[in-house]
Amino acid sequence: MNNTEFYDRLGVSKNASADEIKKAYRKLSKKYHPDINKEPGAEDKYKEVQEAYETLSDDQKRAAYDQYGAAGANGGFGGFNGAGGFGGFEDIFSSFFGGGGSSRNPNAPRQGDDLQYRVNLTFEEAIFGTEKEVKYHREAGCRTCNGSGAKPGTSPVTCGRCHGAGVINVDTQTPLGMMRRQVTCDVCHGRGKEIKYPCTTCHGTGHEKQAHSVHVKIPAGVETGQQIRLAGQGEAGFNGGPYGDLYVVVSVEASDKFEREGTTIFYNLNLNFVQAALGDTVDIPTVHGDVELVIPEGTQTGKKFRLRSKGAPSLRGGAVGDQYVTVNVVTPTGLNDRQKVALKEFAAAGDLKVNPKKKGFFDHIKDAFDGE
């Protein structure tokens, strides 16, 4: 075998960059993979491409191959010793087929989990903003062992199985040959340290449930479902990683007077028919205090009045919303005789036709029994 055959298999020149070699390998690996290409000879082609890439993707093996050919590269490879192995090949293989090992370092610092807390607000608190104390329990660093997980007076030691790497190599025989992948160490669970004498409080986890409280400022104008993020107020991280975050979710209680949509507030005003017909001046409640509203003569049900800047503020700042007052003219019931006469005179004066139901025989009998 000459010193260019591996390059020829990948279709690149001897001066090709690492990116060009990787790109060519990805293309050919996908083209000839046995799970995709069922044509005769595809599997052999795939193995040849794999062999070429295993050598040319490693700088040391590539240098040995360029100087001594395949024999030099195989000598430099040294079987399955070391963590390098098929690392480069597996990362590429994983990107296509989801197999191989993980490139993530399980011993790396990792942020703790986020938490969520629901806070109830009155209608007015949501409008004007407030401050609340949030009390909850979270996983925090163990106070007995200061988060080390080891019994006081002892310390974690380097894991004897993974030698502190947090991962171990596992060789698997496949139809394509021996494959190597990295898995999380089953002794230290990726921490790289063994705890010979676990803390009796946290049982070696380094975490314990603790009561915690924090004050949160609720901005003016919030609505149900909106969240406020408090960085670092979640649960403790792993391997020295930072705490997670706390998300405070707002729940606003309904008002017995108002309804709200965004920055707009709505209020229903009941008027008797005299107020609606003759006009009046009434006090209207708003979240900012009562205001006087002049009701003009002849106001009908459904009429809307706008009170500027009497609504809710916007979370983004700027002008305050408005309040809309919707009129409902209430028809009186249970009129006495004097009121009925007055209404009949009103109808006659306006030439209004009114045809009330005349009482029949059974109506008079019913009235007689009702009067007993």
From Swiss-Prot:
Pfam families: DnaJ, DnaJ_C, DnaJ_CXXCXGXG. GO terms for cellular component: cytoplasm. A zinc finger (CR-type) spans 129-211. It is found in: Cytoplasm. CXXCXGXG motif repeats lie at residues 142-149, 159-166, 185-192, 199-206. SUPFAM superfamilies: Chaperone J-domain (SSF46565), DnaJ/Hsp40 cysteine-rich domain (SSF57938), HSP40/DnaJ peptide-binding domain (SSF49493). InterPro entries: DnaJ, DnaJ_C, DnaJ_domain, DnaJ_domain_CS, HSP40/DnaJ_pept-bd, HSP_DnaJ_Cys-rich_dom, HSP_DnaJ_Cys-rich_dom_sf, J_dom_sf. Zn(2+) 2 binds at C159, C162, C185, C188. Signal peptide: none annotated. One of its GO terms (biological process) is DNA replication. SMART domains: DnaJ. Transmembrane segments: none annotated. Homodimer. PANTHER family: CHAPERONE PROTEIN DNAJ, DNAJ HOMOLOG 1, MITOCHONDRIAL-RELATED. Participates actively in the response to hyperosmotic and heat shock by preventing the aggregation of stress-denatured proteins and by disaggregating proteins, also in an autonomous, DnaK-independent fashion. Unfolded proteins bind initially to DnaJ; upon interaction with the DnaJ-bound protein, DnaK hydrolyzes its bound ATP, resulting in the formation of a stable complex. GrpE releases ADP from DnaK; ATP binding to DnaK triggers the release of the substrate protein, thus completing the reaction cycle. Belongs to the DnaJ family. This is Chaperone protein DnaJ. The lineage of its organism: Bacteria, Bacillati, Bacillota, Bacilli, Lactobacillales.
